[in-house]
């Protein structure tokens, strides 16, 4: 792809500019009104250009609008390729493949999830502000000697065990 070949990267940037400006100026298709070209990747042999696009759509109508925009891009593919060839001055103009870019939509979903997590963290911090620990201040049990079992005054007999007695 364009990352390994500097010439392919330059041509990809040129194709992106040409297609984006041509969609506004020369293609007067209402289906392409909210279409944005996000990235173009060109193979190292300059034969294929993958054009990634996204669409700012209305909630609920995105699938239908996306399908109509894809049809409009496919119908305009020949004209756009011709414009790219004219502006780029290449011997062979790359074949254009239009691919819907899922990344902006997924990024928006991730941002929503992170915002929800941040909101829950704030709520948890508020509930912890006035919280108190349950139970005693010192939750560990300590062994206290009972006075009834053993007194210091009691004499304790200790038997001596010799190894000779056992044999």
From Swiss-Prot:
Keyword Cell membrane included in the entry's annotation: no
Family the UniProt entry places it in: Belongs to the RbfA family.
Cellular compartment(s): Cytoplasm
Keywords annotated in UniProt: Cytoplasm, Ribosome biogenesis
Name under which the protein is recorded: Ribosome-binding factor A
Lineage, opening ranks: Bacteria, Bacillati, Actinomycetota, Actinomycetes, Bifidobacteriales
Assigned GO CC terms: cytosol
Oligomer status and interactors: Monomer. Binds 30S ribosomal subunits, but not 50S ribosomal subunits or 70S ribosomes.
UniProt feature, compositional bias: Acidic residues: 145-167
